[in-house]
Amino acid sequence: MTEIVKVREQLQMSLSDFQEQASLQSGQIFVVGCSTSEVLGERIGTSGTMEVAEAIFSELKQFQEQTGIELAFQCCEHLNRALVVEREVAIKYQFEIVTVTPVRSAGGALGTYAYHNLKDPVVVEFIKADAGMDIGDTFIGMHLKHVAVPVRTNVKEIGSAHVTMAKTRGKLIGGARAVYAAVEETTTCR
């Protein structure tokens, strides 16, 4: 089995397992950070390839077709971890568009591949995603809504890269009288 086939299979299994637990809904935003270098067993930012990026991108697009989610592809630190999204997503969610063209050496392989393969790509600096996947310890947390909840899947690595996933939930706010599940006894002020 080739490395690319293995990466595709691991990603498919990971996304399937994640969706079983997270139940993402159509229109929710799923952020992906990925070091293709780490997938290949190399240090982040040193050996990324468009071949690995294409494999990951195509599996993520299939996941999008199955679930109706919106994808956001995190670029590398040289672009301050900005994100590639479809223009319609940026407009719908009122993300501020910035001017830059990701390239492998400043954007990373996956961000660059996404920029050249989405229908109408733009780059945005900030989003608050509903869920996400981090392949190779790229740190997607800055792009997740509060509160991030880790989701454990059976897949711990994509290729040689450590993989973590998270969904989000609304904050539980209030004090001693706060209630988090509606029950009949909560209809009075006492």
From Swiss-Prot:
Disulfide bridges in this chain: none
A Pfam family recorded for this sequence: DUF436
InterPro entries: Antibiotic_NAT-like (IPR028345), DUF436 (IPR006340)
Family: Belongs to the UPF0340 family.
Protein name (database record): UPF0340 protein BC_5317
